[in-house]
Amino acid sequence: MNSIEFPLIDRTTQNSVISTTLNDLSNWSRLSSLWPLLYGTSCCFIEFASLIGSRFDFDRYGLVPRSSPRQADLILTAGTVTMKMAPSLVRLYEQMPEPKYVIAMGACTITGGMFSTDSYSTVRGVDKLIPVDVYLPGCPPKPESILDAITKLRKKISREIHEDQTSSLSSQRENRCFTTNHKFYVERSTHTGNYDQVLFHQPPSTSEISSDTFFRYQKVQYPPRNEIVN
């Protein structure tokens, strides 16, 4: 068998001690093993599928796609987000453990794209729902751009401090929507359009409606049987 020698490592670490901080060790472990939750809704997600092949080999970044949000620390949104899908996206984000990150991929995810002008059912930017760490523009963005976004996210994680991250969580939650018992509402609105009224509309309960509404009818006057109507 061929022996593999590391003379440089043996010479430098034989009588030395490697010291680091717990914060740097935690950041290094998280940036080296990002487990993404893939949330693709349209054509932008096809570009991400090409990263799985041997040409780009996204496994070298430690990316392991997960099907459960409880096992993921990164959610990658690609495609148009509609009003009906918004509560599901926020619920998936809430089920992810801390610390968690978001990459917004494509023009439709970032601004609504070509559906943002006259569409009544499109969310004009996923940052209206969840906080975004990296914006990846394009229609669709190339696989090289996706790798560049992942690299920028890894650099951001490497510079994080645990105290700063925990203090910023409260400020992030003030600007985002969240769900409790499947009732979608917002703590402080950041919307600029009037479509948020449709998104957060809660229909009245049937118990508040009087029974006369369901049994309301008008009495119909029928002609006598012996009368002939022309």
Swiss-Prot record:
Keyword Zinc in the entry? The reply is no
> Cross-referenced InterPro entries, in alphabetical order?
NADH_UbQ_OxRdtase-like_20kDa, NADH_UQ_OxRdtase_20Kd_su
**SUPFAM superfamilies assigned:** HydA/Nqo6-like (SSF56770)
The cofactor note from the UniProt entry for this protein is: Binds 1 [4Fe-4S] cluster.
EC numbers: 7.1.1.-
Keywords attached to this entry: 4Fe-4S, Chloroplast, Iron, Iron-sulfur, Membrane, Metal-binding, NAD, NADP, Plastid, Plastoquinone, Quinone, Thylakoid, Translocase, Transport
GO molecular function terms noted in the UniProt entry: 4 iron, 4 sulfur cluster binding; iron ion binding; NADH dehydrogenase (ubiquinone) activity; quinone binding
Residues bound to [4Fe-4S] cluster are 43-44, 108, 139
GO BP terms in the entry: aerobic respiration; electron transport coupled proton transport; photosynthesis, light reaction
Name the source's superkingdom.
Answer: Eukaryota
Gene3D superfamilies named in the record? 3.40.50.12280
According to the UniProt record, what class of enzyme is this?
A: translocase
Q: Which reaction does it catalyse?
A: a plastoquinone + NADH + (n+1) H(+)(in) = a plastoquinol + NAD(+) + n H(+)(out); a plastoquinone + NADPH + (n+1) H(+)(in) = a plastoquinol + NADP(+) + n H(+)(out)
Provide the protein's localization: Plastid, Chloroplast thylakoid membrane
Quote the subunit structure annotation.
NDH is composed of at least 16 different subunits, 5 of which are encoded in the nucleus.
Q: What is this protein called?
A: NAD(P)H-quinone oxidoreductase subunit K, chloroplastic
